[in-house]
């Protein structure tokens, strides 16, 4: 089974992430940031990952450290669960619409962290959630999962829809990339022989 549990404790946050890459989309989310929980739910449901997140942080200051550190810890959990990457598809992509909004996410388990994030949010907040924290979440994920990630919101008016389509597309692209390819069961998907 491709499962992992990772704990991250700093002076700013205490986070535990439990992940099953071959799950059914079950989730138990308590990040302390309600909108982040809503977005993590999208990743779990659309990625078909079993995901538990428990976090406490210095949200009395703002949500930045918690959101970023959940991204970091999730990235570490994915890297741990995926192991040596033998047999994975490696690449994943998804387009997801929601009413007027359309987003595209493309991922590569290259071992080279890189993020291209192009989301022209139409407002600064969704409820109390600062949409600038979205890029911090994904930057933390990318740097600790060791992936190249391209995120593009192609159109949208509603900032909630922009966020939601990004997270849904991310879950679906991640699912595709970590899917095991039975034709390549014991091989690394790279001409270098390593990722």
Curated annotation (Swiss-Prot):
GO CC field: cytoplasm
Keyword field contains Heme: no
Pfam families from the UniProt entry: IGPD
Record EC number: 4.2.1.19
GO molecular-function terms, A-Z: imidazoleglycerol-phosphate dehydratase activity
One of the GO biological process terms: L-histidine biosynthetic process
Recorded catalytic activity of this chain's protein: D-erythro-1-(imidazol-4-yl)glycerol 3-phosphate = 3-(imidazol-4-yl)-2-oxopropyl phosphate + H2O
Gene3D superfamilies: Imidazole glycerol phosphate dehydratase, domain 1
Protein name: Imidazoleglycerol-phosphate dehydratase
The species this protein was found in: Cupriavidus pinatubonensis (strain JMP 134 / LMG 1197)
Gene name as annotated: hisB
